Amino acid sequence: MSRLHPPPARAVRRRARASRSGTALLSGLVLLAPAAAAGSLVSAIPARADNPTISLNSLRTAWDAAEPDLGPAQVSASDFGRRWSTAVDGAVFAQPLVAGSTVVVATETNHVYGVSATDGRILWQRALGTPVPSSTACLSPGTGITSTPVYDKATGTVYLVAKSNENGAHFSVHALDAASGAERSGWPVTVQGDPVNSPGVPFDPGTSAQRAGLLLLNGAVYFGFASDCGVGTYVGHVAGVNTSTRKLTLWSTESGSKSQNGGVWMSGGGLVSDGSGRIFIATGNGAGEGSSPPKGPGDKPQGHFADSVVRLGVNSDGSLAPKDFFSPSNNRQLDHDDLDLGSGGPAALPTGFGTSAHPHLLVQVGKDGRIFLLDRDNLGGMGQGPNGTDAVVGTTGPYKGVWGHPGVWGGDGGYVYMIENYGSLRALKYSVNGSGNPQLTSAGTSAEGFGYASGSPVVTSNGTTSGSALVWLVYSGTGPGGQNGELRVYDPVPVNGTLKMRRSFPLGTVTRFSVPATDNGRVFVGTKDGHLIAFGRAS
């Protein structure tokens, strides 16, 4: 098995920097032939590094291939540990971002901070309105900034969505200068109005929550909406804001309905894009007959998309429209049993994991524990396989359900990692079966268990060099509220079916679905008890 070419990466000298924009990663991960893999894996190295979005890039691979200072030897060193902890106002559900030497962290009290990556000093802070009081178990005592923002390196701007309570609950899209925290001229933009496919059924901020991570694509910011912990009547939405004109567009997962659900939450995972005008989402449960797609081909989408993976296209006027979809053939049962497909965020596998017949793959997993391997160019519709089964590239499992999104490692032949709810960290090995089809097979699990809503994995490595990778994740703790959370680090390749935990570090009280950020030999984690914590070697 040949190896994946990583994105443009840092040189191996300590603290050297490289560019890792999400846009570059759309095309920067390609599989090398064996002969090429034996040579240099790293192209010319630009000047600096960033971690601009949830799971590092728009494919949502969560693979940071530019981390020679986070290798096994470095992490096992006696001086690797907590470097600093900075107190912030409010719980941190969003993954921190790294913009140059500044870590940007946002909280549920609508506070945003720029923090020095070196020593944890607060460089700037902003308050973006009063959070909305919430009595739900998901976000009590209030809802502010829940989703992971996105950083546009070209303009030095951080885009984020805040829910605030001035003159009633509403969502605002903010554009902040990453260097100072100042709001850009003409911002914020209020999310309001009717979806393009559901006129007369306006967006309702009162019953909506914005958890899915933001996507920056071709000069627009896109983000999804689901329910506030399943309370009230709601439908899913995808919104987009043009960063130049500030024009807003809305699309509903349930045309003509205000109550048939299909929320876009994905346990905080980000909307996926593999190129211009292509956006992938996963949706949650539907409410009643007709909320999930009926039997039919994916390229003839209808108007109802609960329990589905949907590929949206961006029209010339900036509006969104469904172009393809996949929904399991038992989607009505999933709806009934609260086993939504959209508890998992999708991840697009880098070019090279596929074959000539299926060159562009996507991984999707949900609450019922099945892992679907899909073709991004032909998602499969509903019931289009033999005898009305699923027309997918492959299915693995079922294992325990997943509330999270995958991590990908392109070395050692290729692996995908999942954290099971009340289960284990699971490694799935990529291969091609005897019929020439791509497949994922379970290769091993961790001996340690994970509680409800533990975070999603992140992989660091030095290119695709074998022995350089580690898998990082947040364990949700021993208590119902995230007490005694840990940052755990695992070797990426199972030995005799077991993934070895290399080290763990206490975090205090952590949030659901927490994802660490990595950059330049450091790991950054936000916590429920209001801290941003950095780990690395003493320097």
Show where each model-derived region lies.
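Secretory targeting and sorting signals
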Residues: 2-49
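Cytoplasmic membrane-interface segments at the C-terminal ends of transmembrane helices
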Residues: 11-15, 442-444, 489
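Mobile, glycine-rich extracellular loop/lid and propeptide segments
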Residues: 50-352, 360-381, 400-428, 454-461, ...
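Inter-blade linker and blade-boundary elements of WD-repeat/beta-propeller domains
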Residues: 383-401, 439-447, 501-504
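A beta-strand-loop signature enriched in Asp, Gly, Thr, and Trp
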Residues: 426-460
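Short, charged low-complexity linker/loop segments at the C-terminal edge of domains
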Residues: 435, 538-539
